[in-house]
Structures are given as structure tokens and as C-alpha cells.
């Protein structure tokens, strides 16, 4: 017929709702993808923090080792009656020999002190890197939280439109059935009238 039936109108509404639903679903897919990416960034940043912490602990252990080494040697050198100290004095055949041995010991101590300093500097750099990684992790965490809210909102919109579409589809199907039943009834009535008038 030239006029759209109520079922056609309802089906057109359902089709429009389906288009919106598909658009919302695409939004949801994108938002979910963004959330997954943000979450991965957060995990990566947190892994960097853990790695930096591990390296800091290793450097701290190194520093302690060097400091103990320095302390032991200093005690050996300066403690009265120390074997090393006596060896330096008694083992020296001349003053030049004594001075050379003493200088070697001092150089060793300076080398150790330098090692301690270098290791401390390395630890400070690691601590700075850890702080930076923690800041990145915080930013990534905020981004992930924001992305999750967007995804949740998109999910709610899609679910709402799904319900609208399902409702309209059901109504359209019901109207089609009613129209078919009415048409069948009209045909039956027309047939009865034809028989009666025949």
C-alpha cells in the first residue's frame, strides 16, 4: 500500500536504533582498546619501578661491600701492631721502599674510595630514574582510570541502546503478526461473503 503500516514504522524505528547501537558498539570497542593500552602502559611503568628498585638494592650492596673493604684496610693500616702495618715498616729495605709501599696502600684506598663514590653516584641516578618511573606509573594509572570510565560509559550506552533495539524489534514483530492475523481474518470474511452472496 502507499501508506506505511504500523509494523513498517516500528521496524524503521528498530533499524534506526540498530544503527545507533552499531555506532555505540564501535565507540565501546575503541574505548575498550584505549583502556587496554593504558593498562599496559601502567604495567610497563610499574615494571620499570620494580627494576629500578632492584638495581638500587644491588648498588647499595656493592657500596656496603666497598665500604667494608675500605674500613678493613684502614684498620689494618693504622691499627698499632697490625701485621700489614708492621709488614710495611719491617719489610721495607729502605725509606724509598717504605714510602713506595705506603703510597701503593694509599692509592688502593683512594681507588676504593673512588669506587664507593662512583657506585653512590650510580645509585643516585637509579633513584632518580625510579622516581621518574613512579611519576610515569602515576600518570599511566590516572590515564587507565580515565579510559576505564569512558569504556564503562560507552558500555552502558551500548547496553541501553541494545535494550531499546530489542524492545522495538519485538514490538515490530508483534505488529507484523497482528497485521497478518487481521489480513487473514479479512480474507476469510471476504471468502464467506463471496460464498453467501454466491
Outline where the language-model segments fall.
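Active-site helix-to-loop segments that bind/position phosphate- or nucleotide-bearing substrates
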Residues: 94
